[in-house]
């Protein structure tokens, strides 16, 4: 299993390849706000652990193992953002909140959150009911 830091790199590499068709060390460094030498070290570790294939000065490609995990990590991130929107978290806080929790949830918890998101999305009345509960709770606390 990749560490949380490895997950961040795999997720970002997956997104870059999906968006641009490739991922360079400089692109990864910029996206993650880290020094290129840190990216090189992590990419070498990910290569050793068979998440990607890295050739110095030529770039990198995700292995099937890396693609599968990258896909799952992007899904997890997007699902948690969706969940935060449904429960009414302020849009400006969603990204940082998701970054703060995504590595600490089990895949079982992610799957249950997915069930809950699906439940709310199947009937917009459910979201409206939730907003009513939130408003009532807000009024109680004021």
From Swiss-Prot:
Q: Which residues bind Mn(2+) 2?
A: 11, 77, 99, 102
Q: Where in the cell is it found?
A: Cytoplasm
Keyword annotations of the record:
Activator, Cytoplasm, DNA-binding, Manganese, Metal-binding, Repressor, Transcription, Transcription regulation
A single Pfam family it belongs to is Fe_dep_repress
Q: Which family does the entry's similarity section mention?
A: Belongs to the DtxR/MntR family.
Q: Indicate how activity is controlled.
A: DNA binding is strongly activated by Mn(2+).
Assembly and oligomerization: Homodimer.
Q: From which domain of life does this come?
A: Bacteria
* Membrane-traversing stretches: none
Q: Which InterPro entries match?
A: DtxR_MntR_Metal-Reg, Fe_dep_repressor, Fe_dep_repressor_sf, HTH_DTXR, HTH_tscrpt_reg_MntR, Iron_dep_repressor, WH-like_DNA-bd_sf, WH_DNA-bd_sf
Source species, please?
A: Bacillus mycoides (strain KBAB4) (Bacillus weihenstephanensis)
Q: Which GO terms describe its cellular component?
A: cytoplasm
Purpose: Central regulator of manganese homeostasis.
Q: Which GO terms describe its biological process?
A: intracellular manganese ion homeostasis
Instruction: Write down what this protein is called.
Output: HTH-type transcriptional regulator MntR
The record ties this protein, via Gene3D superfamilies, to:
Iron dependent repressor, metal binding and dimerisation domain (1.10.60.10), Winged helix-like DNA-binding domain superfamily/Winged helix DNA-binding domain (1.10.10.10)
Instruction: Cite the binding residues for Mn(2+) 1.
Output: 8, 99, 102-103
HTH dtxR-type domain boundaries: 1-63
Which Gene Ontology molecular function entries are recorded, alphabetically? DNA binding; DNA-binding transcription factor activity; manganese ion binding; protein dimerization activity
Q: What is its main location?
A: cytoplasm
């Amino acid at each position: 299993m990749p560490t949380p830091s490895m997950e961040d790199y795999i997720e970002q590499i997956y997104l870059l390849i999906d968006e641009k068709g490739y991922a360079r060390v400089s692109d990864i460094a910029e996206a993650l706000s880290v020094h290129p030498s840190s990216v090189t070290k992590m990419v070498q570790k990910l290569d050793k652990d068979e998440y990607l294939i890295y050739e110095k000065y030529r770039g990198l490609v995700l292995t099937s193992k890396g693609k599968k995990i990258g896909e799952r990590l992007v899904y997890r991130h997007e699902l948690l953002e969706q969940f935060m929107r449904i429960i009414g978290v302020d849009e400006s806080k969603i990204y940082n909140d998701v970054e703060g929790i995504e590595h600490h949830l089990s895949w079982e918890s992610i799957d249950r959150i997915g069930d809950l998101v699906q439940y709310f999305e199947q009937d917009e009345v459910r979201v409206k009911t939730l907003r009513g509960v939130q408003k009532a709770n807000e009024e109680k606390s004021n």
